[in-house]
Curated annotation (Swiss-Prot):
Domain of life: Bacteria
Pathway: Glycan metabolism; osmoregulated periplasmic glucan (OPG) biosynthesis
Protein name: Phosphoglycerol transferase I
Family note: Belongs to the OpgB family.
InterPro entries reported for this sequence: Alkaline_phosphatase_core_sf (IPR017850), DUF7024 (IPR054288), OpgB (IPR020881), OpgB/LTA_synthase_biosynth (IPR050448), Sulfatase_N (IPR000917)
Keywords: Cell inner membrane, Cell membrane, Membrane, Transferase, Transmembrane, Transmembrane helix
Native source species: Escherichia coli (strain ATCC 8739 / DSM 1576 / NBRC 3972 / NCIMB 8545 / WDCM 00012 / Crooks)
HAMAP family for the chain: MdoB_OpgB
CDD domains: LTA_synthase
Location in the cell: Cell inner membrane
Stretches that traverse the bilayer: 1-21, 26-46, 77-97, 108-128
Reactions listed under catalytic activity: a phosphatidylglycerol + a membrane-derived-oligosaccharide D-glucose = a 1,2-diacyl-sn-glycerol + a membrane-derived-oligosaccharide 6-(glycerophospho)-D-glucose
Membrane topology category: Multi-pass membrane protein
Amino acid sequence: MSELLSFALFLASVLIYAWKAGRNTWWFAATLTVLGLFVVLNITLFASDYFTGAGINDAVLYTLTNSLTGAGVSKYILPGIGIVLGLTAVFGALGWILRRRRHHPHHFGYSLLALLLALGSVDASPAFRQITELVKSQSRDGDPDFAAYYKEPSKTIPDPKLNLVYIYGESLERTYFDNEAFPDLTPELGALKNEGLDFSHTQQLPGTDYTIAGMVASQCGIPLFAPFEGNASASVSSFFPQNICLGDILKNSGYQNYFVQGANLRFAGKDVFLKSHGFDHLYGSEELKSVVADPHYRNDWGFYDDTVLDEAWKKFEELSRSGQRFSLFTLTVDTHHPDGFISRTCNRKKYDFDGKPNQSFSAVSCSQENIAAFINKIKASPWFKDTVIVVSSDHLAMNNTAWKYLNKQDRNNLFFVIRGDKPQQETLAVKRNTMDNGATVLDILGGDNYLGLGRSSLSGQSMSEIFLNIKEKTLAWKPDIIRLWKFPKEMKEFTIDQQKNMIAFSGSHFRLPLLLRVSDKRVEPLPESEYSAPLRFQLADFAPRDNFVWVDRCYKMAQLWAPELALSTDWCVSQGQLGGQQIVQHVDKTTWKSKTAFKDTVIDMARYKGNVDTLKIVDNDIRYKADSFIFNVAGAPEEVKQFSGISRPESWGRWSNAQLGDEVKIEYKHPLPKKFDLVITAKAYGNNASRPIPVRVGNEEQTLVLGNEVTTTTLHFDNPTDADTLVIVPPEPVSTNEGNILGHSPRKLGIGMVDIKVVEREG
């Protein structure tokens, strides 16, 4: 209803101003600004829905403010471009419509009415309401009854007898198991669900609606609310350090805790969370690549579900035979939005819906088959009688290709339990939420029936039953939950440990690189993860007087304030204000200590603008002074006009990437010398090794041969035509995720370049 009202007010404002208000620059600007805000808010809502399927909420802040945690990023580039182009077109059209009768005399009454209607359209819009609620949730003091409902369980289980297998199905919500809505979509896993304890009404609450948040909620009994934005949990050294979570209790009770997934463990801070709470054995894409049968069989996120669950089964066998009490947690990935992935071993590779193939449904049908096969192996084993199997979704599905069909149903998270010691077959329709999962498991294992805000659904009463407005209540508790982090509110001294790549201050530790916004009563860490904007772009969003501490590789800040360090890959610390003074310090000791030094200076807006403009220069446009092209830093030498076919800088150099261009092309500002030596320090990838690699300058071509290790080769060129472009053509670029950013499409690698130098020859 509010959507229709807000749009009606918007349309009325446009029509009244365009046909009745007449000409007045101030009223035109004011009305266009407010109407433009309406457009921006609704496009933001649309974009947020596109990424997460949940509007503008904490998941958007966590996932989109500084990272794209739930996205295979390459698949969102075109929609992103479309949104920008659409926004530009709408603004242009809006301005043109409002100025239709600009030659008519100004009418104050109609202008005021149009502006009031525009303001009303903004106030009535769902986007404005959601953002307002988010802002309020950030500034509340908390709810006095939090302490009455937040309960810490005993740190041990008195007499543990059962092993635990806990399977998180990525986005595998219970809605998919509705056979009337989606016939024969989940037959194998659905049959297993019907054999166990099936909890049919597990709702999703704020702060539990993305992977790491769902894991925290299910293991600690609290939503993931933090004193920082974005993906900062990937940079902290501990995760809710004061809380008792399921993993802590299991470890204290003699369990060895294992976690296996196909994606990188560092993503979204899962490794930090698990290590902070009792898990000593973690396996992700990096750990598995040396043990899986086919390390090249991967999707955009990591290893396919069939590979991961095979490794989980091997681990289950090994641990069961050892006689050691254990828990084995695993997380699938093939059902990740927007489309999902199909494991090659599946029989169910295709699912049609609405008369056409649907990739997301196909991925669900395939993944549930793999999960069911894993469970059936456990059930057929002699160790099943000592095992509890839990299957749950980490969160509801985000905006995938099945999302519009899911939204037509009553959506709930998946949570069911199969007990080997005491088979029980029952569907329990009790109202509950993800925070109750850990408490229910703890109860089954013989521990307490409460965990944080979670309650056992077998012997306790869920917060979802106690509070009819549980979503609002959860947001009211947000400040109380944030305080559980015990996060410092000031930063005066800090220490950098180069061996660990960590910064420490006020008792907290963070991974480097890191940007910090420091105010009187708050320290806000802004990390650089796989999907966050580079720290310099985040710094460019700071206000002129915001105090900052920026710890990064020297070359990244050198172009602004320390040109002598433009080629240094050491750590440097910059601090100050963008509109005031800044200092850059070179970290020259293994353990380096310093203090914050923010001077209260007069703000220079010209300096601020210059700093912001420089910070926003994209990597390929950065230029530095050097006599060679150094590939492990961003940019290129001043002599280079432009380049293409080259991937991002890494610690050693850069790969050629045929996704960006079939050949490496470096165009110089001026013609290359008549006679010169080309000194290339590089290596080859895969089948490009020991193959002739053409290197061209103008009409002359030389051959380069590289191995898999870095070597230096000198080629001799004559350049009678004054050519200004160097071209290198890898013979067989290889599609691979080697060294790739999690969630990105594979790169096509050919040669790895460390340094290229042009040396003029005499004569």
